[in-house]
Amino acid sequence: MTESRPCHKLKGIQAFRGFAILLIVMSHVVGRGFAFGGESGVCFFFVMSGFVLSMANDEKLRTGKFQTMRFVFHQLRKFYPLLALSLSFFVFAYWHAGYPVDYGKLLTNLLLIQTWFCSRHLVFSYVGSSWFLCDILVFYLFFKPLNRCIIGKSVKSLVLTWVAVVVIYAPFVFLIPSERFNYTLYSFPLFRLIDCCLGIALYRFVMSGEGERLSEQMDKKAYGWQSLILVVLLAFCLAFFAYRDVLPVNFRGVSFFWPFAVLFIFSGSADFSGW
C-alpha cells in the first residue's frame, strides 16, 4: 500500500456526512413515512466511521502506537457527559409525569449495553438515539483487531471472508420477523460491525495501487464523475421510494444501502479538483 493520504482528503467526505445528517433529521421530522432517511443515514455513518477512523489513525496503527483503551476513553469524554445529562433529564421528566423509574432501562443506558438484548423495551428507551452510541462503542473496542485483520489479509482471503459474512448474514434477513427488525438487524452491535468493516475495507482499497489509479482517473474527469454520482444519488432515492413497499424491511433497512454508502464515500475520498 502507498503512504497515507493527507488529512484534507477527508474534506470531500464532509458533503456526504452532511447529507447523511439531513436524511436522519428528516426521518425524525417526517416520521415513519420517511424511515428511508434514518435507515440510509445511519448506514452511511457506520460505513463512514470505519473509513474515517482507518484514515485518521493509519500511522498510529502501522507503527503500533494506537492504544485502544486510550482511544475509547477519549471518545467517551466527547459524548458521555452529554448523554448522562440527557438521560437524567428524560428520567426526571418521566418520573415527574408519574411514571416509575425503570432501573433496568436506566442501567443499560448508562452502561451503553441496551442493544445487546434485542429488546424493544430497551433499545430505544429514555434517550432513543443512544443506541447508536452503544453500537459505535463496540466498534471502537474492536477497531484495532478488525483493522489489522482487514488491512493485513490478501485480496483473495478478504473476498472469501466477505462471501462468508454474506452467507452467514443472509439467513437472518429471511428468518427474523420484520416486526423485530429495529431490535435486531438494525441495532444489534455485531450486525452493525459489518457496516464499519465495509468502511475499513474501502479504506484498504482507496490506499491500494488500484484505488490510487482509479482516484486519479476520476480526478481527471471530475465534472463527469460528479454528474454521474449525482445521477446515481437521484436514482437511489427515486428507486427506493418506488419499490420501498416491495422490498422487505429486513433487506431495504440495512444491506440495501451498503453499495451506495461505499460508492458515495469513495467518491468523496477521491477529492476531485472540481469539488
Predicted regions and their residues:
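Alpha-helical transmembrane segments of multi-pass integral membrane proteins
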Residues: 196, 200, 224-275
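Alpha-helical transmembrane segments
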Residues: 210-216, 271-275
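Non-cytosolic membrane-interface motifs at loop->transmembrane helix junctions
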Residues: 35-44, 181-190, 247-255
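Membrane-interface helix termini and inter-helical loops of multi-pass transporters
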Residues: 99-101, 176-184, 212-214, 244-248
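Transmembrane alpha-helices and membrane-interface helical segments
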Residues: 52-56, 136, 140-144, 148, ...
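Membrane-cytosol interface segments of multi-pass membrane proteins
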Residues: 1-174, 179-180, 221-223, 227, ...
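Hydrophobic core segments of transmembrane alpha-helices in multi-pass, intramembrane catalytic enzymes
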Residues: 43-49, 112, 135-139, 191-199, ...
